[in-house]
């Protein structure tokens, strides 16, 4: 076989030289991206060029046959194509690295450093965001003696249609953090359980609170009022500083997050530094991409209304209507207001502006709500204050980064049907507080990194149980044309109606009072088996066996992907992970 020969070497060398200059003389990026990929590419080109020259020299000695013009053109084409492909790969690799790093700025970046002011306050912890998670965390770490700097985009009272129901398990965490008085003086309502409605029937599900103090129950309220109370609580500590501003990026040095860059409402740029930066900027976080691998799913949208001056059929209970095509949720948020959330599957909504949404609510949804609140529902629709909120689900998939971690909805989300978000956030804060307590000096980078790694494992049993239940229950409650899914939905309602352990067990999981992953899986498949057993009565048939197999398959297809995303080992076997064993430094 003849060696590969490049006859028109000068032109090929010119092409390689121009690509090499392009690679080595690109302007430096303001992001903290290493140029190792470009350097490696340039080295590879030089070696390839040397090999080509050597091949040419050898072939010139051993061959006297001149290539035809078509062969020369082919060599030129191959050389150009190779150069183009190499540059494309390098460029794409660079862009991918930028995307994955998110808004992280290197401390070596000097382009705009002279236009910024450094905040030198001896801060121990920077918290980005002062919502439920950020405010509670600021107060908690402040009580531990940490010097905390909180940066929040807007301190005005927020008006949200979610984050209004705190489960009893979350209230217990609130007590553990010393924040239980934050649900007082905001007209919060006690919640003692749920009532499920389906096809004219209903079943009452009470929280298993017999072993707890009389004050322990769920709480429902205006989210904004609750958050404002926690912010006020944090401000009572002299070592906690709240500042209004927008964090634009994290500051990185040698792979460690050193602080944040932020802009005040006046437009001034500042940099603040601390050994630990905790990002709690909510479900719309623009910083999470540098600290985790976000896989956000939006299965549906909540359409929110406020029903005024009406009473629910069962006082102090959340009401869930298993409607068509999806659930309708109602609960009190004050002594005179009821929040109604209508779930609309998918991401395509009837437009609000042209009245299509109002028509949908009055003709499709109103006939399914309980009779006692139907008139108030229609009145709220006609009033026109209709709001929407996409329902997001995102399993926690962190990128362990020295000096920083994520918390709250910025880190982990689940379908809000079960109201478990605040419970997960508060439980995470308790875990983090206990982990950081032995570390007297947060500047101990090695110890801090190990404890942050432990946090991601220790939070899993509680968080993954609530996450899995929320996402799985939503899929079960959805109306479906599939016969197996329909049977599963019917069986779930009837299973919970049996009472005793069949209702108290699932409700204890939902409320955060007994967040055990194994208990969740057992109850979930107990519902599926209950559905199959009903099909076999009074006499089994081939059709019932086939449908039963489809029910088991459907149940497995619902829960196993969720468990896989949460992490099987961390969820069920956390003690096998070395990261949870950390001795005090």
Swiss-Prot record:
What are the boundaries of the transit peptide? 1-45
Q: What SUPFAM superfamilies does this protein's entry cite?
A: FAD/NAD(P)-binding domain
Its cofactor is:
FAD
> GO molecular function, one example?
flavin adenine dinucleotide binding
> Record's superkingdom?
Eukaryota
**Binding site residues for FAD:** 132-133, 152-153, 160, 231, 247, 409, 422
Q: Give the Enzyme Commission number.
A: 1.14.14.17
Q: Which UniProt keywords apply?
A: FAD, Flavoprotein, Membrane, Mitochondrion, Oxidoreductase, Transit peptide, Transmembrane, Transmembrane helix
UniProt keyword Metal-binding, yes or no: no
| Protein name per the record | Squalene epoxidase 2, mitochondrial
């Amino acid at each position: 076989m003849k060696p590969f020969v490049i006859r028109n070497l000068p032109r090929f060398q010119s092409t390689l030289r121009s690509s090499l200059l392009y690679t080595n003389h690109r302007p430096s990026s303001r992001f903290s991206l290493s140029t190792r990929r470009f350097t490696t590419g340039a080295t590879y080109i030089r070696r390839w060029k040397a090999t080509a020259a050597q091949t040419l020299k050898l072939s010139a000695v051993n061959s006297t046959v001149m290539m035809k013009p078509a062969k020369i053109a082919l060599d030129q084409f191959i050389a150009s194509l190779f150069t183009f492909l190499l540059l494309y790969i390098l460029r794409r690799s660079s862009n991918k690295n930028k995307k994955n790093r998110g808004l992280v700025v290197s401390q070596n970046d000097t382009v705009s450093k002279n236009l910024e002011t450094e905040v030198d306050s001896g801060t121990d912890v920077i918290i980005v965001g002062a919502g439920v998670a950020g405010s509670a965390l600021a107060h908690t770490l402040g009580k531990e003696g940490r010097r905390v700097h909180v940066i929040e985009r807007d301190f005005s009272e927020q008006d949200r249609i979610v984050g209004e129901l705190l489960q009893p398990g979350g209230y217990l965490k609130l007590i553990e953090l010393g924040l239980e008085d934050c649900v007082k003086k905001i007209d919060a309502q006690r919640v003692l359980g749920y009532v499920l409605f389906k096809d004219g029937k209903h079943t009452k599900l009470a929280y298993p609170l017999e072993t707890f103090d009389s004050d322990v129950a769920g709480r429902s309220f205006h989210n904004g009022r609750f958050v404002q109370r926690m912010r006020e609580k944090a401000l009572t500590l002299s070592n906690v500083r709240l500042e209004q501003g927008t964090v634009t990026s994290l500051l990185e040095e040698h792979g460690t997050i050193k602080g944040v860059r932020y802009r005040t409402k006046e437009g001034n740029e500042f940099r603040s530094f601390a050994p630990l930066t905790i990002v709690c900027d909510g479900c719309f976080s623009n910083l999470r991409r540098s600290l985790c691998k976000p896989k956000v799913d939006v299965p549906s949208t909540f359409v929110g209304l406020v029903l005024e001056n009406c009473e629910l059929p069962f006082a102090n209970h959340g009401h869930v209507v298993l409607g068509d095509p999806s659930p309708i949720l109602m609960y009190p948020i004050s002594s005179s207001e009821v929040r109604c959330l209508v779930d609309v599957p998918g991401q395509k909504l009837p437009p609000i502006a042209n009245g299509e949404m109002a028509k949908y609510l009055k003709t499709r949804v109103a006939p399914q709500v309980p009779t006692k609140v139907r008139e108030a529902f229609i009145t709220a629709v006609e009033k026109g204050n209709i709001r929407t909120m996409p329902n997001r689900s995102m399993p926690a998939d962190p990128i362990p980064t020295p000096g920083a971690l994520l918390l709250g909805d910025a880190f982990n989300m689940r379908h809000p049907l079960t109201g478990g978000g605040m419970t997960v956030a508060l439980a995470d804060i308790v875990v983090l507080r206990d982990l950081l307590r032995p570390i007297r000096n947060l500047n101990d980078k090695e110890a801090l990194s190990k404890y942050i790694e432990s946090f991601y494992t220790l939070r899993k049993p509680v968080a993954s149980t609530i996450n899995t239940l929320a996402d799985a229950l939503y899929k079960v409650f959805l109306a479906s044309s599939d016969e197996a899914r329909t049977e599963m939905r019917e069986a779930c309602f009837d299973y919970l109606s049996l009472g005793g352990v069949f209702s108290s067990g699932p409700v204890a999981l939902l409320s955060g009072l007994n967040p055990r992953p194994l208990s969740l899986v057992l109850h979930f498949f107990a519902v599926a088996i209950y559905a199959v057993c009903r099909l076999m009565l009074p006499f089994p048939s081939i059709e019932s066996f086939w449908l039963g197999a489809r029910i088991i398959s459907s149940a497995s297809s619902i829960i196993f992907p969720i468990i896989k995303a949460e992490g099987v080992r961390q969820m069920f076997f956390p003690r096998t992970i070395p990261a949870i064993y950390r001795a005090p430094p």
